[in-house]
Regions:
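Conserved alpha-helical scaffold segments that buttress catalytic/binding sites
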Residues: 2-340
Length: 340
């Protein structure tokens, strides 16, 4: 009689072993690809509550408003594949993410091709179900319009004022692009318009380069949005930068949404992004900031612009994976040192 084994959380599914045979789980070449090999539960509140899920990932493979290099819709799948190189035990926080958070993969939002509004409505419903189940959501885009449904959903779920941090080389404060208000250049403006968001609680971190139009800077100045440029970071150092961003986003707010556009990193580290920029942050600098922000208390985290079609080594997806795993590590063990 041959045995069958299904152990998604251990990164693999194998069949054909005989009873008592030893098995070697190699997630790089076998198994069903979920985030870190996590169990799959749809974004349905009752199902997530029943499983006592404390953290869940959700893919939003949407790039229907992108005006730059394509490929970000492959981001969620690329990131899941990149997690095959990692363990559920995070040695720097001395915690197993499955044991501590019952980490779950909620799959992907069902995209409506060509229709941003309907796609974002679906995304909002999924995010709402996850949060109302008591789980911390990490959302993988998708282009830079993907934070729009995240902040929209969270603004309704957070009782009180909401802060927003966008780590990005670009301001993304366009009010519209060719008349379209859900464009990938508009996530910050759409967020700043929410009824419980004030501009002075919105932090743009890492802004740099010549792809920041005058009209977007005028919007920043007009609305009181706080901008921390790459040159501010260069002058202040990471620790002072973190202090400044904490002051901005948590000043009188009751919840904060964090967004990392992978192009905030120098393109030498993240080749596979939609809008690469030279002169950005290093992975270590971004990791340190992510840890500090999540430790302070982030209610949702979204990562965008992973476009593996330009990245044979899958570097951007691996960076995204590391950022997500460190955010989860802090959630699982806030008192952890973050060192092996």
């Amino acid at each position: 009689m041959e045995a069958s084994t299904v152990r998604t959380q251990d990164h693999y599914v194998t069949f054909g072993r005989r009873e008592g045979d030893e098995d070697f789980p190699n997630s790089l070449i076998s198994g069903i690809s979920t985030f870190l090999g996590a169990q799959v539960i749809p974004p349905v509140r009752d199902r997530l509550e029943e499983a006592e899920v404390k953290a869940a990932v959700l893919g939003l493979p949407w790039e229907g408003t992108n005006t730059c290099r394509p490929g970000a819709s492959y981001g969620p799948r690329s990131i899941r594949r990149a997690t095959e190189h990692y363990l559920s035990y995070h040695g720097e926080f001395q915690v197993d993410l499955f044991d501590a958070l019952n980490l779950t993969d909620c799959g992907d939002v069902s995209i409506v091709p060509g229709n941003a509004r309907r796609t974002f409505d679906r995304a909002e419903r999924c995010i709402t179900e996850i949060v109302e189940a008591g789980a911390f959501p990490i959302i993988f885009g998708g282009d830079d319009s993907c934070p729009i449904p995240v902040t929209s959903a969270m603004s309704k779920l957070i009782e009180g004022k909401m802060g927003y941090i966008q780590m990005d080389s670009h301001m993304d404060t366009a009010e519209a692009v060719a008349g379209e208000t859900l464009n990938h250049a508009c996530p910050v403006s759409r967020t700043a318009e929410l009824p419980n968001v004030d501009g002075h609680n919105v932090a743009l971190v890492g802004i740099n380069g010549p792809l920041n139009p005058r009209v977007e800077r005028e919007y920043v100045d007009r609305t009181g949005i706080q901008m921390v440029t790459i040159w501010d970071i260069d002058e202040w150092g990471i620790d002072k930068t973190i202090e400044r961003v904490l002051e901005i986003a948590w000043d009188g707010t009751d919840g904060v949404v964090l967004h990392t556009d992978l192009d905030v990193l120098d393109q030498g580290f993240t080749t596979g992004v939609t809008t690469p920029e030279t002169g950005g942050l290093t992975p270590r600098e971004v990791i340190k900031m992510i840890r500090a922000f999540v430790r302070q208390g982030v209610d949702a985290y979204v990562i965008t612009e992973c476009s593996s079609v330009y990245d044979p080594a899958n570097k951007a997806a691996r960076v995204a994976t590391r950022l997500a795993l460190d955010a989860l590590g802090v959630r699982a063990n806030p008192a952890g040192t973050g060192r092996v």
